Design a protein with these regions (language model features):
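N-terminal Rossmann-like FAD-binding beta1-loop-alpha1 element of flavoenzymes
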Residues: 12-37
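An anion/pyrophosphate-binding glycine-rich loop and adjacent beta-alpha core
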Residues: 222, 228-341, 399, 408-415, ...
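Glycine- and aromatic-enriched mobile tails/lids
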Residues: 1-3, 8, 19, 31, ...
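Core beta-strand elements of the Rossmann-like FAD/NAD(P) dinucleotide-binding domain
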Residues: 7-10, 185-194, 370
Length: 569
């Protein structure tokens, strides 16, 4: 039996229910719109924010003199000359209001002397990074936004919805989307006056990453297939000190950063030598390297045969007293002890881990994309961070741009009548979701994902060469051929319920096109800048102070350069 499509009509469709998507839904509803918020997992419990444990940057100026201009200057400096200055300025100007609104909603920012307290973070010239505590900031933000949405009759929520394509109306304006319910297999169509992409980044492309399984680049692929441009796809940020060994259960793999910075934790190579001064740091004992340079230093030590046993570096707090560790780490010490980690007598191993993506969908100051009716928010937006994101700006981007996108989408929805989805596009998408003409039932999608992640880790990591990137593109093409053009049939029939193989097929459909966009953009950029380091083109060149755009034309990815001042307006 073939399941009948579930048809939804709404004013604003929000795809992705992390912090950006939830804030967009809240703001759109405050603007008078009826909202349909969908996510491929549980609402407010997937994505990156819920896993982010540390700090959020905003120039509150409550403890030390600060201003959005200071925050902006640090953001621009970190971006290595490629930040979209308009988006960066909006990010820094709007951040304090979002932080204070979250405070009013009960997020529970840490306080001192009756004001929100802040700490420093790498790349910031002063203490402006707020937190709940050093292990619960992201979860607290997510919980707060879920609570604000609860009971809001204008926000309809649906988890376990896999959106496979955006759909235009007869006039070409984006008018909704088509997907399927991963639990039942039922097709879903959504007609909307405005659509917000809030699908996060692409770190799942890499074997070692700090985010959830949702981060496979879905929004980038949806935008490309709909006709939108992406920019800066070559810039994938690797967090330099992701946990490597011993085994750590139930904790964020990037949790070491604030403690490294606060306590002066020592980075040591496999010979137990400090080494960061070889790569641009003035002082080994303090974490002063920006993330891209710290990643470079660890990779180079491993490459030189001076890595730790598992292929990274050591992080040591053995010079700190037990009292100092307890004061800094608080209850984290007990959680580490449960993992048999005693920092007073042992170092841990750390290594770079895929953490964030600076590139994404081209959007303007109102979060409008090039496609009428389509907006974007959060990590899916490209250009704000340039070639390297400033630490603690990630959740800031999510809430600031989520709020802006929701507001703009609601305004747009008021100006137009709902459009009928283009029938041919809907039929094509529903046919792909349906059971007819299915692909090979014995396709091992999990193995294909593992192979793609290995290709990206080995050939499209932070340090690239033309030979590596050529190998990556060839390997991606092989995987695309093996994947085929049709998903496998539901196990046991057309409506047999959850089928992981089928879900992974749709994941790979997106992951492969996004991986190709990253590799092609990296191959085209013949310089080193920020998170993109070419070992065969080691200099940062003035002529390359420009963005690259990626488009999909006739099924072929096209990469072209654009001057920094020529972003969409």
């Amino acid at each position: 039996m073939t399941l009948e499509p579930v048809a939804i009509e709404t004013d604003v469709l929000v795809i992705g229910a992390g912090a950006a998507g939830m804030y967009a839904a809240i703001e759109a509803s405050r603007g008078g719109a009826r909202v349909f918020l969908v996510d491929r997992s549980l609402i407010g419990r997937g994505g990156a924010t819920v896993m982010a444990q540390m700090t959020v940057a905003a120039a509150l100026g409550e403890e030390v003199p600060d201003s959005p201009r200071h925050h902006y200057n640090d953001t621009i400096a970190a971006g290595r000359g490629l930040c979209d200055e308009t988006l960066a300025q909006l990010l820094c100007e709007d951040a304090p209001a979002c932080i204070r609104e979250l405070d009013a909603w009960g997020v529970g920012w840490a306080r001192k002397d009756n004001h929100i307290t802040a700490t420093t973070a790498p790349g910031h010239d002063r203490a402006r990074c707020v937190y709940v505590d050093f292990i619960n900031t992201g979860p607290a933000v997510s919980k707060t936004l879920r609570t604000v949405m609860a009971g809001n009759k204008d926000i309809r929520k649906a988890g376990d919805i896999c959106i496979i394509d955006l759909v235009a109306g007869s006039d070409g304006e984006i008018a909704g989307a088509v997907g399927w319910h991963v639990g039942s297999g039922a097709p879903v169509t959504v007609a909307a006056k405005a659509t917000v992409l809030a699908t996060g980044g692409l770190t799942r492309l890499y074997r070692r990453n700090s985010a959830s399984l949702n981060m496979g680049g879905d929004g980038y692929a949806l935008a490309l297939r709909a006709g939108a441009s992406l920019i800066d796809m070559e810039f994938v940020q690797f967090f330099p000190i992701g946990h490597l060994a011993p085994r750590l259960v139930g904790m964020d793999p990037i949790m070491w950063d604030p403690f490294r910075y606060k306590l002066g934790g020592r980075l040591l190579n496999g010979r137990m030598e400090e080494f960061t001064s070889r790569y641009g740091s003035d002082e080994d004992g303090k974490y002063v390297l920006p993330r891209d340079l710290a990643t470079y230093a660890i990779f180079k030590e491993v490459e030189a045969g001076r890595g730790s046993p598992h292929g990274g570096a050591y992080l040591s707090f053995e010079h700190c007293s037990a009292a100092a560790l307890r004061a800094a780490f608080g209850p984290v010490i007990d959680r580490l002890a449960a993992n048999a980690i005693d920092l007073t007598g042992m170092p841990v191993e750390v290594a770079p881990i895929a953490h964030y993506h600076m590139g994404g969908v081209v959007a303007d100051a109102q979060m409008r994309t090039e496609l009428p009716g389509l907006f974007a928010a959060g990590e899916v937006v490209g250009g704000t961070s340039g070639a390297n994101r400033l630490s603690s700006n990630a959740i800031t981007e999510a809430v600031v741009f989520g709020r802006r996108a929701g507001r703009s989408a609601a305004v747009h929805a008021k100006t137009i009548a709902r459009k009928d989805l283009r029938a041919a596009s809907v039929r094509a998408a529903l046919d792909l979701v349906g059971a007819g003409n299915c692909g090979a039932p014995d396709l091992n999608t999990a193995a294909l994902i593992a192979r793609l992640q290995a290709i990206m880790a080995d050939e499209v990591g932070p340090f690239r060469t033309a030979a590596k990137l050529d190998r990556a593109l060839a390997g991606i093409a092989v995987l695309a051929d093996e994947l085929g053009e049709r998903p496998p049939r539901f196990a046991g029939g057309t409506d047999a319920g959850f089928d992981l193989q089928r879900l992974e097929w749709f994941d790979l459909r997106n992951m492969l096109v996004v991986a190709r966009a990253v590799a092609q953009s990296a191959l085209a950029r013949t310089e080193s800048r920020g998170a993109h380091q070419r070992e065969d083109f080691s200099q940062m060149l003035p002529d390359w102070r420009r963005h690259q755009r990626v488009r999909l034309a006739g099924g072929v990815l096209q990469v072209s350069g654009a001057p920094a001042e020529a972003l969409a307006s």
